[in-house]
A protein has these predicted regions:
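Mature extracellular/secreted ectodomains of secretory-pathway proteins
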Residues: 21, 32-176
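N-terminal cap/lid segment of alpha/beta-hydrolase-fold proteins
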Residues: 168-227
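Short beta-strand element of the alpha/beta-hydrolase
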Residues: 227-237
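Cap/lid segment of the alpha/beta-hydrolase catalytic domain
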Residues: 239, 243-246, 251, 260-291, ...
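Alpha/beta-hydrolase active-site loop
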Residues: 280-319, 336, 346, 351-364, ...
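Short beta-strand/loop motif that positions the catalytic acidic residue
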Residues: 405, 411-413
Length: 522
C-alpha cells in the first residue's frame, strides 16, 4: 500500500441515520489494485451487481493528469465552487458539515502529489481529517435525481423518435440517391482570408479590460462564385478558438456559402490559459455574454463598410442574407444575436447549488445573472437564420427569452451529454419554447457535447464525453447546415427535403442515430 500523508484518512463512515458502517481506505485500495473484497467493503460489494462493482474499481483506478496550479485555479471559480458545494452535501467533514473546503483542499493536495497524482484514493488520503463521512440519505437522493433524469431523458428521446416517424409518414417520398449528397464537399474551391479589425469598444481580454481590441476573423469564401454569397458568422465555444470546427466553415464555403469565424478574445483558448496561469481572476467575466454578441455585430458593421468601399468585397458578399451559427457557448451566443433575450429573473431563480447535478451548464450560465437589464437584448436584425449546436439555454434564456426568437432556428442536441449542456434542459425543452414556425430539432442518439467535434480537439477526453463516432456527427452537421442555410438564406426550396426525418433516416447510422423533428408538445 502507498505511504500515507500526515493526517491521512483512515476510514470512510457511511451514515444512514441511525445506522453507521465503516470502510477503510486500505480496503478500497486493495480492491482497486488486486480486485479483492475485504473487511467492511464486503458489506457494500455484496449489494452491487458485477458490472457495478467493476465500474467502482475502474473509478478508483482513474488518474487525471492536471497540474496542481490548474486544479487550484479551477477550484476557486464560481463554476466549480457551485459543483463542489453540491457534492459537499453528500461528502461531509468530520464535523458533519458541508465537505466543500475539505474536498477542495484534498483535490489540490492530491494533484500536487507527483508520485500518485490525482486519483480518487489519493484524494481520500489527503482529506484533512481522520474520517470521511458519507451522508447516505443525501447520496440516495442524489442518485435518485440522476436516475430520474436519465429515465426521463430516455423516455423523451423515444417520444421524439416516434414524433419523427409520424412526421416522416406525412412527408413526400424523395429518392435521395438522385439528389446531391450534402455530406460531400460542394463544387466551389475555398479561399481562406484572415483579417484584423480594430474595434473601439471596451472588452475583457486575456490581458484585462481593454478600451479597444483587435477582432481577428478568418473568412472562408467560395472562389469564382457566379453570384454574391450569403454569409454565415460562426461563434466558437468557450475556451476554444476560431479554428475549432473549421471543417464546417470550409464545407459551407464549398457549397457557395461564405463563412466568417471571429475570435472571441474574452473566452477563447488564450483567455483560458491566462486564467490557469493566474493572470485572470475567474474563468469568465459576466460581460463576456454581451461582448461575444457585440463581436458579431461589430464584424457585420465592418463588413458593411468594406462592401460599400472595396470592389473585391462588394463582388463577394450579400449582406442581405446573413445567418449565424455556433457550438456550445457559441450556440448560446448565436441565439442571443438571433433574438433570445437574457432572462435575469430566471437566472436569479435557478442559480442555486441544489438545482443541478453534474453539469457545468448552469454554473456557467449563472455568471450572467449580474448583468444589468439594459444588457439583456443583443439581437441584430440583420441576422435572418440561426443554427445552434449544443447551446446552453435553460436559465440564461428560459421560455421567455427563447420565445423572443422570430427567425428560422435549428438546434442540434447530443442526447447523452450529462457534463456540459444536458439535452433535456438545454436543447429539447428549449426547442418547445421557440415560437418561430420555422424551427428544427436534430437529435444525435446517443450523442454527446462533442459528437461533431474534430478528433484532434477531443483526443484527451474520456470516451463517455467523446461519444460514438464523431466522424458521423460531423457529416450530419455538414449536411444539415448546408441545407438549412440554403433554404433560409437563399430561398432554395429544393433543399427543404433535407431538413426532415425522411432524409435523416436515409443517412442515419447505427452507431450514432439521427432524428429530426419540426414540433414537440411542451
Amino acid at each position: 500500500l502507498q505511504t500515507k500523508p500526515v493526517s491521512s484518512v483512515e476510514r470512510i463512515t457511511f451514515s444512514f441515520a441511525p445506522i453507521e458502517f465503516y470502510v477503510s481506505v486500505d480496503e478500497l485500495e486493495i480492491f482497486a489494485k488486486e480486485g479483492k473484497v475485504t473487511g467492511g467493503f464486503a458489506s457494500i460489494a455484496r449489494r452491487l451487481k458485477p458490472n457495478q462493482l467493476a465500474a467502482v474499481r475502474g473509478i478508483l483506478q482513474q488518474r487525471l493528469d492536471y497540474s496542481p496550479v490548474v486544479i487550484s485555479r479551477a477550484s476557486y471559480t464560481q463554476l466549480v465552487e457551485m459543483i463542489i458545494q453540491r457534492f459537499g452535501t453528500v461528502i461531509l467533514s468530520d464535523r458533519q458539515s458541508n465537505g466543500f473546503y475539505a474536498m477542495r483542499s484534498a483535490v489540490i493536495l492530491a494533484a500536487a502529489d507527483r508520485k500518485t497524482g490525482l486519483t480518487p484514493l489519493n484524494v481520500m488520503r489527503h482529506f484533512p481529517s481522520k474520517d470521511i463521512r458519507v451522508n447516505l440519505n443525501a447520496l440516495l437522493q442524489f442518485t435518485k435525481e440522476f436516475s430520474a433524469q436519465a429515465k426521463y431523458r430516455d423516455a423523451m428521446v423515444n417520444a421524439i423518435a416516434q414524433q419523427a416517424e409520424r412526421e416522416a409518414a406525412t412527408q413526400a417520398s424523395v429518392d435521395f440517391s438522385r439528389l446531391p449528397d450534402l455530406r460531400q464537399p460542394g463544387p466551389s474551391k475555398v479561399i481562406k482570408k484572415t483579417m484584423t479589425f480594430t474595434i473601439n469598444a471596451s472588452r475583457p481580454t486575456s490581458l484585462g479590460l481593454a478600451t479597444s481590441y483587435p477582432l481577428l476573423v478568418d473568412f472562408y469564401l467560395p472562389e469564382n462564385s457566379p453570384q454574391l454569397a450569403p454569409l454565415v458568422v460562426y461563434s466558437h465555444g468557450f475556451g476554444s478558438n476560431r479554428f475549432n470546427n473549421e471543417y464546417v466553415a470550409r464545407h459551407l464555403a464549398s457549397h457557395g456559402i461564405a463563412v466568417a469565424t471571429p475570435e472571441h478574445i474574452g473566452s477563447n483558448l488564450e483567455y483560458r490559459r491566462a486564467f490557469f496561469s493566474g493572470l485572470r481572476r475567474d474563468v469568465i467575466e459576466p460581460s463576456e455574454f454581451v461582448s461575444r454578441a457585440a463581436d458579431m455585430t461589430y464584424l457585420l458593421n465592418e463588413l458593411e463598410r468594406l462592401v460599400s468601399t472595396d470592389p473585391e468585397w462588394k463582388a463577394r458578399l450579400d449582406l442581405q442574407r446573413v445567418g449565424v451559427m455556433g457550438a456550445s457557448f457559441g450556440g448560446t451566443t448565436a441565439l442571443a444575436i438571433a433574438g433570445a433575450k437574457i432572462n435575469l429573473a430566471r437566472l436569479n431563480q435557478d442559480c442555486r447549488p441544489d438545482t443541478f447535478l453534474f453539469s457545468a451548464s448552469l454554473p456557467l450560465q449563472c455568471y450572467a445573472k449580474s448583468l444589468s437589464p439594459d444588457q439583456t437584448v443583443l439581437r441584430d436584425p440583420r441576422v435572418k437564420a440561426v443554427f445552434a449546436s449544443y447551446p446552453l439555454t435553460s436559465a440564461i434564456y428560459g421560455p421567455e427569452g427563447m420565445g423572443k426568437i422570430t427567425i428560422p432556428t435549428m438546434i442540434v442536441s447530443g442526447t447523452h451529454d450529462i457534463v456540459m449542456s444536458p439535452a433535456i434542459d438545454d436543447q429539447i425543452r428549449p426547442f418547445t419554447w421557440l415560437k418561430t414556425p420555422q424551427k428544427y430539432l436534430a437529435l444525435f442518439v446517443p450523442g454527446t457535447h462533442y459528437s461533431s467535434s474534430e478528433d484532434r480537439y477531443i483526443a484527451r477526453l474520456p470516451e463517455f464525453m467523446r461519444g460514438p463516432s464523431p466522424a458521423t456527427g460531423r457529416e450530419y452537421l455538414e449536411a444539415l447546415s448546408v441545407a438549412f442555410f440554403q433554404v433560409h438564406l437563399s430561398d432554395r426550396q429544393d433543399y427543404a427535403p433535407y431538413l426532415n426525418q425522411a432524409y435523416a433516416k436515409t443517412i442515419s447510422q447505427p452507431e450514432l442515430k439521427l432524428d429530426i423533428v419540426r414540433s414537440l408538445k411542451k
